[in-house]
Design a protein with these regions (language model features):
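C-terminal motif of bacterial Sec signal peptides marking the signal peptidase cleavage site
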Residues: 14-17
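Beta-rich carbohydrate-recognition and catalytic domains
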Residues: 21-25, 29-73, 81-129, 137-295, ...
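Bacterial N-terminal signal peptides that target proteins for export
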Residues: 1-7
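Short, charged beta->alpha transition segments
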Residues: 6, 131-134
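Hydrophobic, well-ordered secondary-structure elements that form the walls
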Residues: 356
Length: 400
């Protein structure tokens, strides 16, 4: 959790009382109205070919389930990859977004380009820690998973949660090695990216104090490198790394800002733009996206164009959120760059943390999580409520 539970609820009370006329619910039925994975109506965005519920939290509305063994009511933190000719999918399940050991990761495989998924592995949290934020990467023909483990502590800005990034690997996606620490105490690894045989991740310090680049040559042993962004007053955290065609490294730094700005409903919405050139020994951060705070971002290229899926903040709506598709334009090798909002996926409440896998040069499978769409709760209330994992196929050739 990014804030104390009591603080969250206190902040939520004025938000839910706000006029939310500007954030009408999206036109998808509540996922408990049918089987998980059933097709649902979606907003009329031309690039979204289909969308459906893949993991149904509404079917597990029981506060006393053993989430280390079964799917529970709050499902989140997705990722996708392709491995051995199949699409692989991972997500977290728990009772809520609150930190705790009653949580697990579920790993699935699809051999029909994401139409259906079969569970291949269940990876419960350590007995005294929470687990979350999984991401796939591959080393020497094996599938690897990075995740974050934290103590079950309620604190502001993830302070004193003693984050430890852990890793595990598998030759087949079914049989996994034991979880082992791959990062130092107090640092959260975001997504892992590979470039010329070297693995990179941006790590943010507990308390959301700074972001530092880490590198590895084997995906297991990681070494701290240069700072990416160190202005702790901006509350920097999840930082998505993207290698550009010309070799520049882009870091998009989520900045939650001041106490009043943490929930994204008032004040500034900003994402810091940081750059590094080979051999990536220093970063400069000359610009920022003003008006867009990209929470939990995932970037991907499609036919030379750079896209991002991230949480979108709808200010003035009582704290409502969406998962949105953006495109980054401009000079992609060092800037300046700009951001274009292409529209929203079916989403509401606690939402985003998407995964992306290419199906063909213009079609991509996307996963994300969302609260009940017709209910359209605020983000804060959604953190404690039911969430489903959605999947959709997007056609980026429709974006002209």
């Amino acid at each position: 959790m990014k804030f104390r539970c009591a603080l969250l609820l206190a902040l939520a009370l004025p938000l839910v009382a706000c006029d939310a006329d500007n954030a009408a619910p999206l036109s998808a039925p509540s996922p408990d109205a049918g089987d998980a994975g059933a097709d649902a109506p979606v907003e009329t965005v031309p690039w979204l070919e289909s969308a459906s519920v893949q993991v149904n939290g509404h079917a597990a509305n029981d506060l006393y389930l053993d989430c280390r063994d079964v799917i529970c009511r709050h499902n989140e933190n997705t990722d996708l990859t392709t491995f051995q000719g199949a699409v692989w999918f991972v997500h977290r399940t728990a009772i809520s977004q609150t930190l705790g050991p009653n949580s697990a990761l579920h790993v699935y495989r699809s051999t029909d380009q994401g139409v259906t998924f079969t569970q291949m592995a269940l990876l419960p949290a350590p007995t005294t820690r929470d687990i979350r934020d999984p991401c796939f990467y591959q080393v020497n023909g094996e599938l690897y998973l990075k995740a974050l483990t934290r103590l079950p502590v309620d604190s502001s800005r993830d302070s004193n949660v003693d984050t430890v990034a852990v890793g595990m690997h598998s030759p087949d996606g079914i049989n996994w090695s034991a979880m082992e620490p791959i990062g130092p105490h107090g640092w959260s690894f975001w997504r892992v990216k590979e470039q010329n045989g070297v693995y990179y991740t941006a790590a943010y310090q507990d308390g959301d104090l700074q972001v530092v680049l880490y590198t590895s040559t084997d995906g297991v042993t990681w070494t701290a490198g240069p700072p990416i962004y160190t202005v702790s007053a901006d509350t920097p955290l999840e930082t998505e790394l993207t290698f550009m065609p010309g070799g520049m490294l882009l870091g998009l730094v989520r900045m939650d800002g001041t106490d009043d700005e943490l929930l994204g409903d008032e004040g500034r919405l900003r994402t810091k733009i940081c750059w590094s050139s080979p051999p990536y020994t220093s970063f400069s951060c000359p610009d920022e996206f003003d008006g867009e705070r990209l929470d939990g971002p995932v970037t991907f290229f499609a036919q030379g164009r750079l896209f991002v899926v991230a949480r979108q903040h709808l200010q003035g709506t009582g704290g409502k959120k969406r998962t949105a598709l953006y495109e980054i334009t401009g000079e992609l090798d060092g800037g300046p760059i700009y951001i274009n909002d292409w529209g929203q996926f079916p989403s509401a409440g606690d939402t985003s943390y998407a995964g992306v896998a290419m199906l063909d040069p213009s079609h991509f499978l996307v996963t994300w999580y969302s609260g009940d769409i017709p209910l359209d709760q605020s983000w804060v209330l959604g953190m404690f409520n039911l969430t489903d994992i959605w999947k959709g196929t997007i056609d980026l050739s429709k974006l002209q």
